[in-house]
Amino acid sequence: MTPPHEGPTAELEEELALAAKADEPERVEKRRIAKVIGVLALSAFVMILNETVLGVALPVIMDDFAIAASSAQWLTTGFLLTMAVVIPTTGFLIQRFTTRTLFVVAVGLFLVGTLVGALAPTFIVLLVARIVQAAGTAIIMPLLMTTTLTSVAPRYRGTVMGLNSVVISVAPAIGPTLSGIVIHSFGWRAVFGFMLPVIAILFLVGVVAIRTNHETRRPSFDVASMILSAFAFGGIVYGLASIESLITHGAWQPIVAFVVGIAALLVFIVRQVSL
C-alpha cells in the first residue's frame, strides 16, 4: 500500500528540483559577473592608488636623478595629461573591443609601466613608465563603470556603483600615506615593486575569469573630435597643473595652454552638438 501523501510529496520534490535546475544558469551568471566586477574593481583600485603614490617620492627622486623640481613634477603632470587625452577615446574602444580585450590591454600596459618604473635607470625612462601606466589607468576606469551598467541587474546596480565610487575615492586618498611608509622603509622604487606582484596576479585572474558575450560594433571614429579633445583636456589639465610656475616664475606657457584648451573645448562641444 502506498503511504499517504507520498505521491504529492514526490511531485513537490520533483518540481523543486526542476526549479533549482532552472535557476542554476542564473546563479552561475551572477557569480561570473561578480568575479568580473571584482577583478575590475580591484585592478582599478591599484591603478588609481598609483596616481598619487609618487607625490611623496618626488624629493627623493629629485636627489637620485639630480633633477629640478619643475622636471620631477612632470611625473604627476604627465600622468594627468595622458589620462586626459586617453579617457575621451574609451567610448569608442568599449564599443569596438570586448571587455576581456580591453582589460588585457589596460592592465597589461599598467603592468609593463610598473616594471619599467621599478627598474628605470634614468628620469626619462621613469617618465615614460608613468605615461604607460596612465594609459592603462585611463582605460580601466570607464571600463569598470560601463561593465557595471551593462552587466549588473538593475536592483543591484546602485549598490555596485556605490562600491565602485568607494574604490575611486578611497584609493587616491590613502596613496600618499602608504607610499610614505614604503618610501621611508624601502626607497621609492619599492612603490613600484610592491604593486608589481599585485597587479600581475590580478592580470592572470582577469584573463581566466573575464568572459564576455556582448557583441562588438565598428563605430565610426571621429579623428577631428579626438584631436580637439586632446587639445582641450590636455591644455586645461596642463594649465591647471602648471599654475605654480605661473605664480612663482611668471611663466606664460600655462596661460597659453589653458586658453588653447578652453578654445578647443568650445569647438569640440559645438562639433558634438552638430554631429
Q: What are the residue ranges of the model-derived segments?
A:
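Helix-boundary and loop/linker segments of multi-pass membrane transporters
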Residues: 25-33, 116-119, 218, 247
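Extracytoplasmic
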Residues: 35-90, 175
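Cytosolic juxtamembrane N-terminal segment immediately preceding the first transmembrane helix
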Residues: 1-49, 63
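Hydrophobic transmembrane-helix bundles of small-molecule transporters
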Residues: 184-275
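Hydrophobic transmembrane alpha-helices of multi-pass secondary transporters
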Residues: 32-48, 79, 109, 113, ...
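Transmembrane alpha-helical core residues of multi-pass small-molecule transporters
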Residues: 43, 59, 79, 109, ...
